[in-house]
Regions:
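Hydrophobic alpha-helical transmembrane segments
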Residues: 17-22, 50-51, 70-78, 94-95, ...
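Membrane-interfacial segments
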Residues: 34-42, 67, 71, 107, ...
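Hydrophobic transmembrane alpha-helices
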Residues: 2-71, 75
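Short helix-perturbing small/polar motifs within transmembrane alpha-helices
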Residues: 29, 97-135, 185
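Aromatic-anchored segments of alpha-helical transmembrane domains
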Residues: 24-32, 79-87, 125-135
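Membrane topogenic helices and adjacent juxtamembrane segments
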Residues: 1-35, 148-157, 161-172, 197-203
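Interfacial aromatic-anchored transmembrane helix boundaries in multi-pass membrane proteins
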Residues: 35-40, 44, 80-110
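Membrane-embedded alpha-helical hairpins and interfacial helices in multi-pass inner-membrane proteins
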Residues: 45, 120-193
Length: 203
């Protein structure tokens, strides 16, 4: 146990940073592919975070297995947030991923990045970061609309979103993210069993 704690507390090496960067790129692609179908439809866009969470679990968990040290997940989330922001997403979408990545890093760290259950919970929390923009949409729809119009979103798209939005959609969005990311984490644990055993990750 002491060796695991010491390993976790050691600073990130150049190799760790390179690995984190590579997996961040892969994770971004998988989240993008999973969510793009929903993002293009103003009615289904609320489920973009759920779609994004469906495919990326194995990549996320493999990153933890490769670099089971503090700050790797946080760095991944910050980089992803920056990419989302510069590609025209709402600032709250980017910020949501950044904040939840830090929270997810802390949760996985509680188990020294060796617990399948905590690592899976960490992924679920990270996936909830994608709801940031939609939370702002429900809290301040006019402000959200102005920001997105400035980012190039069409008025008709926003009008359809506002006509569709209700409390039921908000609740369904959170439930869907939790379900899809939990499934993705479960599949990831099954797929990466050998890698987890090598890294000393247990239930």
């Amino acid at each position: 146990m002491s060796n695991q704690v010491n390993s976790m507390n050691k600073g990130l090496t150049v190799k760790d940073l390179v690995t984190t960067g590579i997996f961040t790129a892969l994770l971004f692609v998988f989240v993008l592919v999973g969510g793009v179908f929903f993002a293009t439809n103003p009615v289904l866009t609320f489920f973009m975070p759920a779609g994004g969470g469906l495919l990326a679990g194995p990549i996320y968990l493999l990153l933890i297995a490769k670099v089971h040290k503090r700050w790797s997940l946080s760095i991944m989330g910050v980089i992803m947030g920056i990419i989302w922001f510069v590609t025209g997403m709402h600032w709250a979408f980017a910020l949501g991923y950044m904040i939840m990545a830090i929270v997810a890093d802390f949760v996985a760290g509680v188990g020294q990045y060796k617990s399948k259950e905590l690592n899976s919970l960490s992924y679920i929390l990270f996936s909830l970061g994608g709801t940031g923009s939609y939370i702002v949409f429900f809290v301040d729809p006019n402000g959200w609309a102005q920001t997105m119009l400035g980012n190039g979103t069409e008025q008709s798209y926003i009008d359809t979103m506002q006509a569709t939005a209700n409390t039921g959609i908000l609740i369904a969005m959170f439930v869907a993210v939790i379900i899809t990311s939990a499934i993705s984490a479960f599949v990831g644990c099954k797929m990466l069993k050998k890698q987890f055993e090598k890294a000393g990750i247990t239930a």
